[in-house]
Regions:
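N-terminal cationic leader/targeting segments used for protein routing and processing
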Residues: 3-4, 32, 147
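Short, solvent-exposed polar/charged micro-motifs at secondary-structure junctions
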Residues: 16, 79-85, 139-146
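Extracytoplasmic electrostatic interaction patches
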Residues: 105-172
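Bacterial N-terminal signal peptides
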Residues: 9-17
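Bacterial N-terminal signal peptides that target proteins for export
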Residues: 1-9
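C-terminal motif of bacterial Sec signal peptides marking the signal peptidase cleavage site
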Residues: 18-22
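Terminal processing/anchoring signals of secreted or surface-associated proteins
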Residues: 1, 23-24
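Short helix/turn-capping signatures at newly exposed starts of structured segments
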Residues: 24-121, 125, 129
Length: 172
């Protein structure tokens, strides 16, 4: 149990650095996305299969989410991370894998607020909102789970233009 706690803490620390750098206040990109019009017509979820490998995620991204490009692959003593970006508007996906087993344990997807209606409709249609979980519409803060409750999806606004969707797996 302690091992999973340390992985969770590591994921949160890594997410903090991604949050603070993924949605910068670059004036040019802010002007591009200040419109109220969505930049997508439908949303594709990032790869989120528990215990998947780095190669599984790379294959999915190159096939299903090919508007994203691999912008970084890092490794340290406890984890491997893949960072994908679109190259515009601070959108990106961060995958985290355990170094020991090479299995996927966390996904953070940074999306544009203007696409929120499309994304939240998808999440509401596919997942169950967790009853009693803290909810804040202004901050786009929601919590969802899949049918077998093996995954928790949380969302939160991280800037005026971006919000994060965090996929975390639950061990039973």
């Amino acid at each position: 149990m302690k091992k999973y706690f340390y992985y969770a803490i590591s994921a949160l620390l890594m997410a903090t650095s991604v949050i603070t750098t993924s949605c910068s206040n670059d004036d040019d990109s802010l002007n591009e996305i200040r419109s109220d019009k969505p930049t997508i017509t439908h949303w594709v979820e990032p790869y989120h299969v528990k215990d998947a490998t780095v190669e599984d995620a790379k294959a999915y991204m190159s096939d299903a989410m090919n508007r994203y490009a691999l912008s970084g692959e890092t490794s340290n003593s406890s984890s491997i991370q893949l960072c994908y970006t679109t190259g515009v508007n601070d959108e990106g996906v961060l995958y985290s894998f355990t170094k020991h087993t090479g299995s996927l344990y966390s996904i953070i997807d940074t999306e544009l607020v203007v696409n929120g209606d499309i994304i939240f409709k998808y999440l509401n249609d596919k997942y169950d909102e967790v009853p009693g979980a803290y909810k804040n519409e202004a901050r786009l803060q929601y919590t969802f789970t899949n049918q077998d409750k093996s995954m928790v999806i949380t969302t939160v606004r991280v800037s005026d233009v971006c919000f994060n969707i965090d996929y975390s797996f639950i061990s039973k």
